[in-house]
Every structure is written in structure tokens, then in C-alpha cells.
Regions:
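Residues on the lipid-exposed face of transmembrane beta-strands in outer-membrane beta-barrel proteins
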Residues: 29, 37-41, 67-73, 90-94, ...
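Cleavable N-terminal export/targeting peptides
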Residues: 1-23
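Short loop/turn motifs that connect adjacent beta-strands in outer-membrane beta-barrel proteins
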Residues: 19-24, 45-46, 74-84, 102, ...
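Predominantly the C-terminal beta-signal and adjacent terminal strand-loop region
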Residues: 60-62, 119-153
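Transmembrane beta-strand segments that form the barrel wall of outer-membrane beta-barrel proteins
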Residues: 21-33, 43, 47-57, 88-96, ...
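Gram-negative outer-membrane beta-barrel proteins
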Residues: 35-37, 57-61, 75-77, 96-100, ...
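Residues that define the transmembrane beta-barrel architecture of outer-membrane proteins
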Residues: 23-25, 31-35, 61-65, 84, ...
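Mid-chain, well-packed structural core segment of small domains
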Residues: 79-119
Length: 153
């Protein structure tokens, strides 16, 4: 499984970090379903790419990789300090089962969440719920939910 973590980092992080501007790349932790490392890179004022390399600890232990394209609405929840965008998007999830008894699952993600980005620091905290439509090896519905934080640099 250590090789899967390395593969996830090799696939997801380096190509994205080349697009990052100052304070546009965030790296942190996601806790829930799944639990692991989370990243986000802003791709303009209201859009971002986000993802995780994590463990899915639900019904079966599995290594989880996902990447999402996100749209942000900064006006829905106005705050006096910092920023609190609502976000939604579309992404992909790969689920590699540890026991080898089940096939690798590939699904489409529909993330919904909010992230508070502090005005005085480079920290963002988020909560999200994500309906997932697995397409391979068979069609199935799943639901992920998590909280997390990222440091932006």
C-alpha cells in the first residue's frame, strides 16, 4: 500500500503545483470518509482543482484517490473577516481495495462544501459531502463526507 500512496502523490501533486501562484496551492488533511492528505490549487478567482490521496475506511479498507474541478460562490455566505465560499463541482474517484477480493472502483464525484479561509493566515478549513456514482466494475451509489484543513503557500 505504500506504493499506492507514492503513486497517488506522483500522479496528483507535481503537475498541479507547476500552475500554483503565491498562496494558491494548499496542502493539508482530510478526515472522515476518506481520511488522508488533501490538496487544492486555485485556477483563477472562483475555480479550483482539489483532490486527495487517502484511506477509505468504510465498509472495506481501500486506498482512495480523487480529483475534482470546483466552482466557488463567495457571495452565498458573507463574512466580515476572511472568506467563506460555498463550492460544488465534478470529479473522479479511484478506489483500490486492500484485500484484493473486490475490483478497483471508478466513479464520478459531485462534491458540495464550504471552506472558511482565514484573512490573517494561510489556513483554510472545510467540510464537504460528496455523492458518488460508481461506474466500474458496476454501477453503484456511494456517499462520502469529511472535514479538513489546508495550509496555503
Amino acid at each position: 500500500m505504500k506504493n499506492m500512496w507514492l503513486l497517488g502523490l506522483i500522479i496528483l501533486l507535481p503537475p498541479l503545483s507547476s500552475f500554483a501562484q503565491h498562496n494558491d496551492f494548499g496542502l493539508g488533511v482530510i478526515i472522515g470518509e476518506p481520511t488522508g492528505l488533501s490538496w487544492k490549487i486555485w485556477a483563477g478567482g472562483k475555480n479550483a482543482l482539489a483532490g486527495a490521496a487517502a484511506w477509505s475506511l468504510g465498509r472495506t479498507d481501500a486506498f482512495h484517490l480523487h480529483a475534482d474541478y470546483l466552482f466557488h460562490n463567495f457571495r452565498l455566505f458573507p463574512v466580515s473577516k476572511g472568506r467563506l465560499p460555498f463550492y460544488y463541482g465534478l470529479g473522479v474517484r479511484f478506489l483500490f481495495h486492500e484485500n484484493g477480493e473486490e475490483s478497483t472502483k471508478v466513479g464520478v464525484r459531485f462534491p458540495l462544501g464550504i471552506e472558511y479561509i482565514f484573512a490573517t493566515s494561510s489556513l483554510g478549513i472545510f467540510i464537504e459531502i460528496v455523492p458518488i456514482l460508481d461506474l466500474s466494475p458496476g454501477t453503484d451509489f456511494d456517499l462520502n463526507a469529511a472535514i479538513g484543513f489546508r495550509f496555503y503557500f
